Amino acid sequence: MLERTLSILKPDVVKRNIAGQVNSYIENSGLKIIIQKMCLLTRYQAEKFYEIHKSQVFFVPLINFMISGPVVVQVLEGENAISLYREVMGATDPKKANSGTIRGDFAENIDANCVHGSDSLENAIREIRFFFSEYELLSLYEC
């Protein structure tokens, strides 16, 4: 099934100037990057985006990390994009991530683990709408 999913290249990727390499992993998997933009999240935006984790011990460090520098937010499209991108990302903990995955090859630790990807269709829709307006998504077809 053709799906869309949200990808975030986290501040460690931008800071280390490896966004191009990460994008190669995405594109080599067969996924298309249909829109992307770089932005600097405010604390409010980061807290709102990750509010599902608010009660977790890692919430504050996660928010501080996500606002520490620019991120690249992307919409990826392809067959079974959500599950495929989760495979391409690798396990959340890079120590458990397979070689050949983004986290297995690039992540420094569980906190600076390079990427975020939607984990369900429902979350993909919500997360894409969080970062991209209907106009931005519609304009993809109006060039």
Curated annotation (Swiss-Prot):
Its cofactor is Mg(2+). Pfam families: NDK. Keywords: ATP-binding, Cytoplasm, Kinase, Magnesium, Metal-binding, Nucleotide metabolism, Nucleotide-binding, Phosphoprotein, Transferase. InterPro entries: NDK-like_dom, NDK-like_dom_sf, Nucleoside_diP_kinase, Nucleoside_diP_kinase_AS. The keyword Ubl conjugation does not apply. It is found in: Cytoplasm. Its main location: cytoplasm. It is an enzyme of class 2 (transferase). Major role in the synthesis of nucleoside triphosphates other than ATP. The ATP gamma phosphate is transferred to the NDP beta phosphate via a ping-pong mechanism, using a phosphorylated active-site intermediate. Homotetramer. This is Nucleoside diphosphate kinase. The lineage of its organism: Bacteria, Pseudomonadati, Pseudomonadota, Alphaproteobacteria, Rickettsiales. The gene is ndk.
